[in-house]
């Protein structure tokens, strides 16, 4: 491709609403253009990157035995009503009506449609396993679209769906997809981690997220430097502390803490470590009548160490809270504690509550908690002496750096990541809702076991940029670059020798199958170099009259600070060697 025929459009300044590097650089490099909130046009330069992502994903999906199809972007609501998602999903699901007042949705995923295909087409165990995938536009009406392609409303996604005869076979399909994902992200040349993720009601280790490592990532990735353990924050287990609980050493006292309503403020006032305080979180579960209407509520008190944060996914696995919970209302809090939030605790309750303590709190002695009286806290609190042992003990918190690794091979560290892929065993949720069955060897109908596997096609380039950029612009890995090599002739419009040499090298690289661009726009060297450094083409060759007289060209990788002189006759072989590195 020649630059004069292509569309190169760069900006000196990023739009004011671009908050992260990928958004700023993709806009400045002319890769995307904002059309509306969370909606972007993929400009020619950006589309080339997206097509390269799609090509690698498609190759590896086909290699893994998945079969490509394309499902409609606009789908009849009746399928979504079968599974209940039409009503259960919030405003993220875009619902529309046609001229006949029939309901439709704009797909965010396609479980319903692919399950409908399976129930019509898969009759026998002999047809299994099957794995269908598509690379298709999706729409999710995000409340706060931001960060460009990282969290847009319209996006391109690869979504795959496997169908198997039983859970063991589904696990095999899952593993094949997880292996394919590792090959995909290895080929992209990105630093990533595959981390265990929460698998919901299915249980087991049947869910993994693929996270590109980036300081600006929204997700916390927990890992052990001394082993292969990695999980997302929702999944990472906080082990029970080793050793017995210390003996009580302090008397129980009611201590004035005027105006100090947070654990941090109380610890500072009393001159004690934050880890000696205990925070009280009040939840509620609704009690329903036979018709399913709320007729009352059960109030719960969760106790966590003051320097720890509650993990809602873990809390949702506590017996009694696993059917759904909410934060208690102020009226419920006052009814049970007789006090406003900020001074709550497990002592001196007006009405009984169900008490759940985090594992860490169970081994604490002489701790500090609210006195259920404004401007007062209780100090020197001890289990057994001052209050009964809790009804339930569970892992309720997010892990922190330095916690023991669940695999026993060291301590945990935490880094940031951007989720670009997810593999997950669905089980029979959708097949039961939509009656998707097959006949086994005995001729008996069985529900299909399903898995789903997603990759954010348009999110991935943004994640790659967050990991690979500098003050000059993007630094693409070879596999993702819009062009792999750019030939930059200086004074091509004035020097026949430079023009001939540039055209010859361009044709030579094209013939060798290199994705090369010749910049024949006649730009000044500084402007030309700045454009390609911003756009992030990884390999640059500069041709000049002076260099030709010396029999040399200048090569520079995008990560290099200086150019390397290379004999003109061997430049193609030199570049090929760089590809192999």
Swiss-Prot record:
Enzyme class: ligase
PROSITE patterns, sorted: AA_TRNA_LIGASE_II
GO cellular component entries: cytosol
Keywords, alphabetical: Aminoacyl-tRNA synthetase, ATP-binding, Cytoplasm, Ligase, Nucleotide-binding, Protein biosynthesis
Main location: cytoplasm
GO molecular function: aminoacyl-tRNA deacylase activity; ATP binding; proline-tRNA ligase activity
Intracellular or extracellular location(s): Cytoplasm
Entry function: Catalyzes the attachment of proline to tRNA(Pro) in a two-step reaction: proline is first activated by ATP to form Pro-AMP and then transferred to the acceptor end of tRNA(Pro). As ProRS can inadvertently accommodate and process non-cognate amino acids such as alanine and cysteine, to avoid such errors it has two additional distinct editing activities against alanine. One activity is designated as 'pretransfer' editing and involves the tRNA(Pro)-independent hydrolysis of activated Ala-AMP.
Domain writeup: Consists of three domains: the N-terminal catalytic domain, the editing domain and the C-terminal anticodon-binding domain.
HAMAP family: Pro_tRNA_synth_type1
SUBUNIT field: Homodimer.
Protein name, per record: Proline--tRNA ligase
Taxonomic source organism: Variovorax paradoxus (strain S110)
